[in-house]
UniProtKB/Swiss-Prot annotation:
Origin organism lineage: Eukaryota, Fungi, Dikarya, Ascomycota, Pezizomycotina
Similarity remark: Belongs to the PheA/TfdB FAD monooxygenase family.
Positions that bind FAD: 10-39, 241-243, 289, 310
Protein known as: p-hydroxybenzoate-m-hydroxylase A
EC number(s) stated in the UniProt entry for this protein: 1.14.13.33
Organism: Aspergillus niger (strain ATCC MYA-4892 / CBS 513.88 / FGSC A1513)
Domain of life: Eukaryota
Gene name of the encoded protein: phhA
An example Gene Ontology molecular-function term: FAD binding
UniProt keyword annotations, A-Z: FAD, Flavoprotein, Membrane, Oxidoreductase, Transmembrane, Transmembrane helix
Effect of gene knockout: Abolishes growth on benzoic acid, benzaldehyde, benzyl alcohol, p-anisic acid, p-anisyl alcohol, and p-hydroxybenzoic acid; and reduces growth on p-coumaric acid and cinnamic acid.
Reactions catalysed, as given in the entry: 4-hydroxybenzoate + NADH + O2 + H(+) = 3,4-dihydroxybenzoate + NAD(+) + H2O; 4-hydroxybenzoate + NADPH + O2 + H(+) = 3,4-dihydroxybenzoate + NADP(+) + H2O
Amino acid sequence: MAPSQQEKYDIVIVGAGPVGIVLSLCMSRWGYKVKHIDNRPVPTATGRADGIQPRSTEILRNLGLKRQIMAFKPAKVYDVAFWDPLPGGQGIHRTGSWPSCPRFIDTRYPFTTLVHQGKIERVFLDEIQKAGTTVERPWTIVGFKNDGLDETYPVEVQLKSIDTNVIETVRTKYLFSGEGARSFIRQQLGIQIQYKDPISYVWGVMDGVVRTNFPDIETKCTIHSDAGSIMVIPREDNMVRLYVQIASSDDPDFDPRKTATAEDVQATARKILQPYWVEWDRVEWYSVYPIGQGISEKYTLDERVFMGGDACHTHSPKAGQGMNTAFHDALNMAWKLHAVESGLAKRSILSTYETERKDIAETLLSFDNKYAALFSKRRPTAGEVGEASHTTAAAGGEEDEFVKTFKSSCEFTSGYGVAYKPNVFTWDATHPAQSPLFDVPGVRLTPGRAFTPTTVTRLADSNHVHLEQEIPANGAFRIFIFAGKQDKTSKAITDLAANLEKERSFLSVYRRADIADVSFFENHLPHSKLFSICLVYAGEKNQIDVDSIPKILRDYHHHLYADNIPDVRVPQATYAAHEKLGFDVEKGGVVVTRPDSHVACTVQLSEGSGTVDALNAFFGSFATKPLGQDSQQSRL
């Protein structure tokens, strides 16, 4: 069939696991034509990933999905208990506990949400359907090539119905593999997985309903005993997940292909939990897997065919990072494709998908390797330790290292440790192309990290709102203007507004084509579909003169706020949001966040054109059109 006769798509997504469904939802909602297939006849029914970390919960809320997932009444894990062997082979005892999301991590969701992957998929699939895309099942990919025969849709993809063997050939701008560890697309590209270490541990995982007198069965636990190791994960519907060590490279007869029956794992669990007992009412799901940490050499070869999720990185599931990392992969991919296809960004920016996400995966694997080794390594038996075990030093020293690693890793495992390095989208004060305005004295935000949660009062309706959630995940860059005290910054705000209205400002150059028809009730994108603005004043609502706010900012009538809500993290502050983020209320400041809510840059709020000049310089570094005055020196 000639390319002109083939059905054309903006993107073809293969696989409907975590990375595929997030990417599919974003691209479908943002107006793209998506072809999405999965080789399974039905979505995940049981098992697989089940832990949503705090930062991922924040992302789900920004996607408008948190409420649906919480409707499943998932387990919420606020802390982790550590259990270790008693001396003399007398069983196990609790040696301590630690918050799963310690207070130094600023989050609204200081817990891990536990609900099985199938229920999470169900929520996404319903929303994908509402956005106009259907996941076609069971279909698989049998071939593809970037032949360039169609300049706009350069990739030809061959898909096959598993039920009927019918072959369908389509063309697409992009092809994305969310197929998992056995990715056909990765294999066809000849991209290898680099394994950090040979398989060292084999684990069994079992979901079921249990009866037990073990006191922490509803708490996440790491348990080391003379008989082996277990991790306990509470689940929804009175279930519990047990990860049970089956084999270790420390065993004289270690076999990485070793397997075990569900009954074998139950017997091992009973031994490990002594002196407590455990019995199973039912087993919902059971699997055996080896641990092998690996990462793909490349995430793309041509920036037309991409991969994400387990197709790119494999690791042990006990730190609960697989699904969460996939969410981040997908969101990163989605907003960058949108930036290019909307006409905002040059195609060259797509290279940052691999550099950013592979760097995070490397960090994950480094952490996971250490965490898995500490968790999986067998304790010395009571007989081996002998009388020395009475001091607990022999066993306790190793646990100290495990607990230390766990505590130091909390920020990373929560998702808030993700920090993208400086690049075209992430500018700090050291960026070579900068003006001094990118260095905001006292600011506490770090470019590359997630925007800090803050609570403010929305002027339109006096609602107390979470500022970081006020702009939904719509693919737009977010510009937060912390305007300080209105009487101190009125000229700076007037000048900023006047410069935003100039013909060559980023907001004007990328103005909506349908701006004359935009409804008064368009809360988020009244001027451009690529930028959204929020304005926060330090003061009480009744002290803020809305009429004196320039019209271009007043058009964001649902994005005008008063900074008047106390925050326990800055208890002495009169204006908590400004104080928490490090903005002087006499001067104010501006924060740009990327569409994934990671901080892109911070800019001083200055009189004249300087602030908008700086913003034009930032956006102009990747924009497809020239921004700003030719001299970049204009002043009002």
